Amino acid sequence: MKNELMQRLRLKYPPPDGYCRWGRIQDVSATLLNAWLPGVFMGELCCIKPGEELAEVVGINGSKALLSPFTSTIGLHCGQQVTALRRRHQVPVGEALLGRVIDGFGRPLDGRELPDVCWKDYDAMPPPAMVRQPITQPLMTGIRAIDSVATCGEGQRVGIFSAPGVGKSTLLAMLCNAPDADSNVLVLIGERGREVREFIDFTLSEETRKRCVIVVATSDRPALERVRALFVATTIAEFFRDNGKRVVLLADSLTRYARAAREIALAAGETAVSGEYPPGVFSALPRLLERTGMGEKGSITAFYTVLVEVDDMNEPLADEVRSLLDGHIVLSRRLAERGHYPAIDVLATLSRVFPVVTSHEHRQLAAILRRRLALYQEVELLIRIGEYQRGVDTDTDKAIDTYPDICTFLRQSKDEVCGPELLIEKLHQILTE
């Protein structure tokens, strides 16, 4: 009775500033810690004694707090002291991060210190709608399959929907070379450690790495770090945008972020509702994605990869993300199996700002290209079995004649960059001659 009364008093009259609040671990699981720690707030950092390990409050039930540790729970035990630090996790930001590799909490992974950095809260509010500048300028990626029929706008948010093994990582490397970007922020979530090192050393050029901040949280890292990595990358991109830069944010992948968030939510007692995801995962997505886009001065053009199984674009997470973004790029396993790279399905790819950022001439050429691809796909089976008869439909005949040139135009090597003038010239050559 006395202990219950004391707990109620602590909740009603929280300790004054400067007062050290501490408690003890009561339960340890593979993902979370349950501690008696009255008076804490959601997102507060805590320190676990005696090892000085950090954890974050992800749930509160009366005087008990659910903590997600920054490291593995192996070695932790009941009875350890936990001290509330009265602050939230902050992220290093600054020009000094360019060319550096950091982990999901913002700590350097290349063995060097981070001089000349500022610190910002990881979970900032998105810019108000009326403060944002409208999207009016194109952001050319240098990739013909995107710039020709789904031109991106500066400040647009695009999803890259792909099954595993169809060239997603190579496409991200090509997007890092976007000629219109001042700086890039690349976040790799849940990837294998071997692939991360190979991607940084061999897929990205040295010049690209110099203007890129790379945030890494491999598949073996705790769920909190895999979730936090995307917040850290977004916060760094916001810093560059607020300084008037044109930033490209590339996140691989949003699916692995959602799976890590699901892992924490289920361990905290949330119930899975849609596609095995708790409601908290879907409620956090809009707030996170809305942080990118146009600002008052600069812009963040964001590309988020989404893993889809058996090219199912209607699974719950893919469907939700597609509804929140300003466009989508679809990678096709069928094209990848034919050796067609980048394996972008042009007919399934869409940019919602395409009519705003392109000229009338460009839109006409893109419409012709889409129509000819669609006509060819309608009769492709007839052509393969020798049943197609020329002369029945003139438009279909033109589509068949130009199809090889269109495929050549849409293919592109990893190191090749196509400028806007050359792009329009090539479209004219293929479609109007």
Task: Briefly describe each language-model feature range.
Residues 2-18, 24-141:
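Acidic-enriched and Gly/Ser
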Residues 1-13, 422, 426-433:
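Short, charged, intrinsically disordered terminal tails
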Residues 148-150, 155-433:
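P-loop NTPase catalytic core
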Residues 20, 96-97, 147, 233:
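Glycine/charge-rich, flexible interdomain linkers and switch-proximal surface loops
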Residues 80-82, 96, 109-156, 169-174, ...:
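P-loop NTPase nucleotide-binding/switch module
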Residues 6-9, 85, 141-146, 233, ...:
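Phosphate-interacting basic helix/loop segments used at nucleotide- and nucleic-acid interfaces
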